[in-house]
C-alpha cells in the first residue's frame, strides 16, 4: 500500500471531518478553527475539500509538494488542492470520463488561487513534448492575462475576479494536455465607468499607467491616474494602489502573456491605444448646444485625441455621441432623421460606448487565448470552474443579482449531487439508509429563472415595453411574488428595493438601473463609428457576433406559455431570442450561459472545493467565528458531513468494478464472461477470506457500495501487484519474443550476408579467372593444376597471416599505416648460383616482400625481410611458353627476382590486379619466351627451357622434387629447365569449389 510521511507536529484536529468523534456543528467549527490557526488550511469531508484563505504564503506548494501528491489516493495523504487535482486527473485516465472541479465560495475566499494551483499541478505532472509544453505554457499564461483584464481590487478582495471563468483542458490518449477552451461569464463592465469608494477599476488600467515607458505614455497620451474621471468617480481621494499588487511588474507579465497566447506587438499597441481611449472617454464633458435642445462636446482637443487613438473621424465621433439616427417606415418609404441628445443622454451614450468597447475587448482576448489552444478533435476534458462568489454589498444591483443567481444554481448542483442524489441512490439500490434532512434551494432558483413567471422573464418582458421602467418593474415583482417564501418586498415610501432570501442569506437589491443594464443598449451610431475605424481591432470586436444556441422545442414552449398566460402576442414574439428586430438582453444571454454551463457540469464527474473566507479584514490566520459559521451553514457542509458519515465512500456499477478488478480474482481471471454481479460477489468473497470486510460492503441492485477506504486500499494494492506481475510476465514474453526475433533476423542477415559475400566472391573469382585467361591463353602451355582455380585460392592468404600481429605491424612499419596484406604464399627462389632456395612471398596493396622464417624471438619476430620491391619498380614479368612454373620479375635498376611456385596463376592474376589499382590503371607487362634473360647479383643470367618427352632423373635442384612435369638443373651461367609437354596454350582456366 502506498504510504505518505506525515508531519506529526502538524497533526492538529482531524484531516477529514468524517473522523470527528462528536458530530455537531460546533465540533465542525472548532476543528476548522484550530487547523486554520496552525496554518492547516485544507480539511476534507470525504471527497469534498474545504479550503480556507490564509491571506499569506504558507510554503505548501511547488514541485516537492507536487511529487508527494502525484498518484496518491486522497485517503493516503493530508488534504490539499493538489489531491483534488490528482484525483480528477487519475479518474480521467482510469475511467475515461470527463471531470470537472467546482470551486465555490464568497468573494475573497481564495477561489482564483485554488484554480491556479490546479492548473499548476496538471501542468507539472503531464508530458513535456514541444507541443504539450506550448499548450501548458499558454494555459498557465492565460491566468495573469485574464486577471489583468478581468480582476480588480474590491473592499473584500484585492484581486477579485469580476467575471466568471470555466476552463476546459482537453487531454490526448497519453494523458497530456493537447488544448482547451475558456468560457467567460458576465464581466462586470459597469466597473469601467464607476467604482465604489475604496475600490479600483480593472488592473490593466493601472498597469498601463504605471508600467508604460515614457515613449509609450507619449504614444498613448497617458495621464496620471488621478486625472481620469473613470478612475476617480465617486471616490473623494481615489484608490490607485492595492496591497500585494505591483502594477509595474504586472504590466510586464501581461505583455509576456499576450505574446505567449499569440497577441503580437502591433496588436498589443492597438489594445493599449484602445484602453487609453476608454479612459479618456470618461473625461469628455458636454455642454448644451446653442439651440438649447441638444448638446456639444466641450473639449474638442480631447475629442481629437480620442478619435486619433480609436482611428475614427473626430467629427463623426462627436456626432455619434450627441445625436441619434432614427429610422421610420419600411421598404421604399423608410426615412432617417437625426435626433439631438441632451447632455445627460450624451453622457449615457459615452459611458455605454466605453463599457461596450471594454467588454468586447475582453471577449476578444478570451477568443485569442482559445484560438491558441484550440483542438479540432474531441477528447476527454477536466473543467475548472472559477466563478465570482456570492456577494452581499450595501448597494446590490443587477450585477450582484446575476452573480448570486449563478451561485444559487451551483449550490443546487452541489445539493443535487452530494446530498439529494446520493441519498436517492441508496434508496433506489435498496441500501439500508436513514435520510438526512437538508435545505433545498430549488425554489429560489425557480424564483429567478422559471418561465414564464420568473424574475428574469419578467425583466425581459418589461424591457420590451417603451413605458417600462425600474418602478413598473418592482411593482410587477411585488405583485407576482408577494407570497413567495424566498421573496420579500420592502415597505418604504420610495419602493426601490426588493429582497431575495438566498441560500447564503437575505440580500437587498436596489432596482435602480436594472432595466438599463438588462437592455444593455448601445446605439447603432456608435457601432457604425467603431466599424468604420482604421484600427482593425475595433472593427473586429464590434463586428464579431457570438454564436447563440437556440433550442427550437424550448422556443415553441416559451411561445405557447406566453399565449396561455394572457400575454400579448407581440410581446411573446419579441421575447423569443431568434427575433432579429430585438436585441438579446443581458439577463437572457447570461441565463443561456448558465444553462450551458450546467449542462457541461452535469455531463462530468464532479469534484468540489468549498472555499471559506475566515475574516473580512484580509488578515493572516484571523478567525471570525460568526462569519465562518455563516459560510459553513449556507455551503451545506454540516449536512454533507452527515451524509458522508452515514454513507459509503465508494460506489461503482458491477460492470465497471469488474473491469477494474477482475484480474485479482482467481475465479475471474483471465476473462470473466458471466454476470457482472456474480463476478463481483466471487471476487469480494475471495477478498473476505483475507480480511473481514463483510460489514464494510453492501450490494445494491446495480452497484457495489464500500463504506470505508481500507478495502479499497487492499483492492488497489492487489491490483497494482497483479498488474506488476502481469507486466513482468508480458515483459518477459516480449523480451523472449524480441530476442528470438532478433536471433532469427540476425541469422537471416548472416545467411544473406554469407550468400552475398559468396556471390561477390564468385563474381570476383570469375573476373580474376577471365583476367588469368587473358594473361596466359595462347601464350603458355598449361598444366592441369594451373587451370583449375579454386574460389578459396583467390582469397590469396595461403599462409594465414592476415591476423598475425607481427606480420601486420612489420608491414605497416615498412610501408606505412595503410599497408594491408593481400597475398601470402611459399615460393622457390633461384639464387645467384642457380640454386633453389625456399622463401615466402608477401604482397600488399603496393609492395612485394620476400621473407625467410626463423625461430620466434622474445620480441615476437619470426621472419626476416630479404627483399622489398615496390610495384612502381617492376618493369615486367617474364614466363616461358611451356607448362613450367618459373617466372622472372624484372626490376628497374636492380637485380631481378627469379621465382617458382605452383600457385603461379593465382599469384600473377592477383598481382596484376593490385598493380593496376595502385598505379591508376597502368597494365603490368608480361613476356613469354623460349628462354629468359635476367640479372642476378653476379650479373647477367638465363633460364633455358627444353621440352622433353620424358624425365628420367630427378635433380636435387628441382623445386618440385616430386613433380612429374619439369626438372631444373644448374649449369655454369644458366639454369636448365626440362619440361614435359603440357596442355594446349588455348586451354582456359576453370573455377572449382575447392
Curated annotation (Swiss-Prot):
Q: Where is the TH1 domain?
A: 782-970
Q: What is a biological process (GO) this protein takes part in?
A: pinocytosis
Asked whether the keyword tRNA-binding is assigned, the reply is: no
Instruction: Show the stretches that span the lipid bilayer.
Output: none
Statement: the UniProt record of this protein carries the keyword ATP-binding: yes
Annotated GO CC locations: actin cytoskeleton; cell leading edge; cell-cell junction; cytoplasm; cytosol; myosin complex; plasma membrane; pseudopodium
| UniProt GO molecular function | actin filament binding; ATP binding; calmodulin binding; microfilament motor activity
Tell me the segments the record calls region Actin-binding: 574-654
Its biological function?
A: Actin-based motor protein, possibly involved in a wide range of motile processes, such as cell movement across a surface, and extension and retraction of pseudopodia or lamellipodia.
Q: Which family is annotated?
A: Belongs to the TRAFAC class myosin-kinesin ATPase superfamily. Myosin family.
Which protein, by its recorded name, is this?
A: Myosin IA heavy chain
Amino acid at each position: 500500500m502506498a504510504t505518505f510521511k506525515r508531519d506529526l507536529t502538524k497533526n492538529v484536529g482531524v484531516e477529514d471531518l468524517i473522523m470527528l468523534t462528536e458530530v455537531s456543528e460546533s465540533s465542525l467549527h472548532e476543528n476548522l478553527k484550530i487547523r486554520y490557526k496552525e496554518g492547516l488550511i485544507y480539511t476534507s469531508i470525504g471527497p469534498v475539500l474545504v479550503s480556507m484563505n490564509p491571506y499569506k504564503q504558507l510554503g505548501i506548494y511547488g514541485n516537492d509538494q507536487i511529487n508527494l501528491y502525484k498518484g496518491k489516493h486522497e485517503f493516503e495523504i493530508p488534504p490539499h488542492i493538489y489531491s483534488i487535482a490528482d484525483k480528477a486527473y487519475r479518474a480521467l485516465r482510469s475511467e475515461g470520463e470527463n471531470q470537472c472541479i467546482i470551486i465555490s465560495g464568497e468573494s475573497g475566499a481564495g477561489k482564483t488561487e485554488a484554480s491556479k494551483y490546479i492548473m499548476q499541478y496538471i501542468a507539472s505532472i503531464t508530458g513535456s513534448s514541444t507541443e504539450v509544453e506550448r499548450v501548458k505554457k499558454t494555459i498557465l499564461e492565460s491566468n495573469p492575462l485574464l486577471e489583468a483584464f478581468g480582476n480588480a481590487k474590491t473592499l473584500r478582495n484585492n484581486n477579485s475576479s469580476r467575471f466568471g471563468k470555466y476552463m476546459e483542458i482537453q487531454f490526448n490518449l497519453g494523458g497530456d494536455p493537447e488544448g482547451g477552451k475558456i468560457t467567460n461569464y458576465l464581466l462586470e463592465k459597469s466597473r469601467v465607468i464607476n467604482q465604489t469608494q475604496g475600490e479600483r477599476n480593472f488592473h490593466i488600467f493601472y498597469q498601463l499607467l504605471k508600467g508604460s515607458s515614457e515613449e509609450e505614455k507619449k504614444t498613448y497620451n497617458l495621464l496620471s491616474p488621478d486625472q481620469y474621471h473613470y478612475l476617480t468617480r465617486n471616490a473623494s481621494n481615489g484608490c490607485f494602489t492595492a496591497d500585494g499588487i505591483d502594477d509595474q511588474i504586472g504590466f510586464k507579465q501581461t505583455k509576456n502573456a499576450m505574446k505567449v497566447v499569440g497577441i503580437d506587438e502591433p496588436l498589443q499597441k492597438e489594445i493599449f491605444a484602445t484602453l487609453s481611449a476608454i479612459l479618456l472617454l470618461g473625461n469628455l464633458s458636454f455642454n448644451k448646444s446653442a439651440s438649447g435642445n441638444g448638446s456639444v462636446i466641450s473639449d474638442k482637443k480631447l475629442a481629437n485625441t480620442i478619435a486619433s487613438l480609436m482611428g475614427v473621424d473626430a467629427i463623426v465621433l462627436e456626432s455619434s455621441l450627441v445625436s441619434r439616427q432614427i429610422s421610420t417606415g419600411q421598404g421604399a418609404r423608410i426615412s432617417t432623421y437625426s435626433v439631438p441628445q441632451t447632455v445627460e443622454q450624451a453622457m449615457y451614450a459615452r459611458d455605454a460606448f466605453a463599457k461596450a468597447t471594454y467588454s468586447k475587448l475582453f471577449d476578444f482576448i478570451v477568443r485569442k487565448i482559445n484560438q491558441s489552444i484550440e483542438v479540432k478533435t474531441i477528447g476527454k476534458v477536466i473543467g475548472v470552474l472559477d466563478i465570482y462568489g456570492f456577494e452581499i454589498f450595501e448597494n446590490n444591483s443587477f450585477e450582484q443579482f446575476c452573480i448570486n443567481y449563478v451561485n444559487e444554481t451551483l449550490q443546487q448542483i452541489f445539493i443535487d449531487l452530494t446530498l439529494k442524489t446520493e441519498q436517492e441512490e441508496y434508496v433506489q439500490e435498496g441500501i439500508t439508509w436513514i435520510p438526512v434532512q437538508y435545505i433545498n434551494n430549488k425554489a429560489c432558483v425557480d424564483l429567478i429563472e422559471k418561465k414564464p413567471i420568473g424574475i428574469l422573464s419578467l425583466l425581459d418582458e418589461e424591457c420590451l415595453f417603451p413605458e417600462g421602467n425600474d418602478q413598473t418593474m418592482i411593482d410587477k415583482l411585488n405583485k407576482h411574488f408577494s407570497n413567495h417564501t424566498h421573496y420579500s418586498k420592502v415597505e418604504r415610501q420610495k419602493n426601490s428595493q426588493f429582497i431575495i432570501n438566498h441560500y447564503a442569506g437575505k440580500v437587498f437589491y436596489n432596482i435602480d438601473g436594472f432595466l438599463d443594464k438588462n437592455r444593455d443598449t448601445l446605439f447603432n451610431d456608435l457601432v457604425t463609428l467603431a466599424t468604420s475605424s482604421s484600427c482593425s481591432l475595433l472593427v473586429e470586436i464590434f463586428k464579431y457576433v457570438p454564436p447563440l444556441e437556440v433550442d427550437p422545442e424550448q422556443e415553441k414552449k416559451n411561445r405557447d406559455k406566453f399565449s396561455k398566460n394572457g400575454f400579448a402576442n407581440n410581446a411573446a414574439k419579441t421575447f423569443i431570442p431568434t427575433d432579429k428586430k430585438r436585441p438579446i438582453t443581458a439577463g437572457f444571454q447570461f441565463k443561456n450561459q448558465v444553462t450551458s454551463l450546467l449542462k457541461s457540469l452535469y455531463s462530468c464527474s464532479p469534484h468540489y472545493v468549498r472555499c471559506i473566507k475566515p475574516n473580512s479584514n484580509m488578515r493572516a490566520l484571523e478567525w471570525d467565528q460568526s462569519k465562518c459559521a455563516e459560510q459553513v451553514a449556507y455551503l451545506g457542509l454540516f449536512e454533507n458531513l452527515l451524509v458522508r458519515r452515514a454513507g459509503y465512500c465508494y460506489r461503482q456499477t458491477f460492470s465497471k468494478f469488474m473491469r477494474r478488478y477482475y484480474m485479482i480474482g482467481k475465479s475471474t481471471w483471465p476473462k470473466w464472461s458471466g454476470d457482472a454481479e456474480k463476478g463481483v460477489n466471487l471476487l469480494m468473497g475471495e477478498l473476505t477470506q483475507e480480511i473481514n470486510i463483510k460489514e464494510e460492503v453492501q450490494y445494491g441492485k446495480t452497484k457495489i457500495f464500500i463504506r470505508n477506504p481500507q478495502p479499497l486500499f487492499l483492492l488497489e494494492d492487489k491490483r497494482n501487484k497483479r498488474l506488476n506481475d502481469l507486466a513482468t510476465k508480458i515483459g518477459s514474453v516480449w523480451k523472449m519474443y524480441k530476442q528470438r526475433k532478433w536471433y532469427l533476423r540476425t541469422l537471416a542477415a548472416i545467411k544473406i550476408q554469407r550468400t552475398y559475400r559468396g556471390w561477390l566472391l564468385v563474381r570476383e573469382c570469375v573476373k580474376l579467372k577471365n583476367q588469368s585467361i587473358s594473361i596466359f591463353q595462347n601464350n603458355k602451355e598449361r598444366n592441369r593444376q594451373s587451370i583449375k582455380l579454386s574460389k578459396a585460392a583467390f582469397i590469396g592468404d595461403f599462409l594465414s597471416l592476415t591476423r598475425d600481429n607481427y606480420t601486420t605491424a612489420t608491414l605497416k612499419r615498412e610501408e606505412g599505416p595503410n599497408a594491408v596484406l593481400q597475398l601470402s604464399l611459399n615460393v622457390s627462389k633461384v639464387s645467384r648460383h642457380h640454386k633453389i632456395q625456399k622463401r615466402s612471398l608477401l604482397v600488399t596493396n603496393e609492395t612485394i616482400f620476400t621473407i625467410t622464417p626463423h625461430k620466434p624471438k622474445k620480441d615476437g619476430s619470426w621472419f626476416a625481410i630479404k627483399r622489398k620491391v615496390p610495384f612502381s619498380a617492376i618493369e615486367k614479368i617474364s614466363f616461358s611458353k611451356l607448362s613450367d612454373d618459373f617466372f622472372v620479375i624484372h626490376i628497374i635498376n636492380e637485380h631481378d627476382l627469379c621465382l617458382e611456385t605452383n600457385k603461379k596463376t593465382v599469384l600473377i592474376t592477383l598481382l596484376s590486379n593490385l598493380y593496376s589499382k595502385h598505379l591508376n590503371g597502368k597494365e603490368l607487362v608480361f613476356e613469354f619466351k623460349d628462354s629468359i634473360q635476367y640479372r642476378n647479383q653476379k650479373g647477367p643470367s638465363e633460364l633455358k627451357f627444353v621440352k622433353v618427352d620424358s624425365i628420367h632423373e630427378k635433380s636435387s635442384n628441382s623445386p618440385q622434387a616430386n613433380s612429374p612435369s619439369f626438372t631444373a638443373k644448374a649449369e655454369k651461367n644458366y639454369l636448365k629447365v626440362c619440361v614435359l609437354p603440357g596442355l594446349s596454350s588455348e586451354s582456359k582456366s576453370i573455377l572449382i569449389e575447392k
